[in-house]
């Protein structure tokens, strides 16, 4: 599934009674919660538990849904956001990730 298709499908599950700011607030609270749940699964792995791959994928899917909800609230296209992110990373690390470049990022590099 492509990101644009996912975003369009995920839109059905947004509470349309909220304003754009309400939708984005809901999404950001939810995103924090889901990242915490995902973190908990990986924290247990450090304690000797095996990662439940299916559970982790479902939590990661929830993270994706909340990211899509923020984008949709403001009419932003996930494909465009993904492309912008890759372009930013390519400009920052033209030869792939380098620790030295990470330690000495240019001023204003967000």
Predicted regions and their residues:
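Flexible "arm" and connector segments at domain edges
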Residues: 1-110
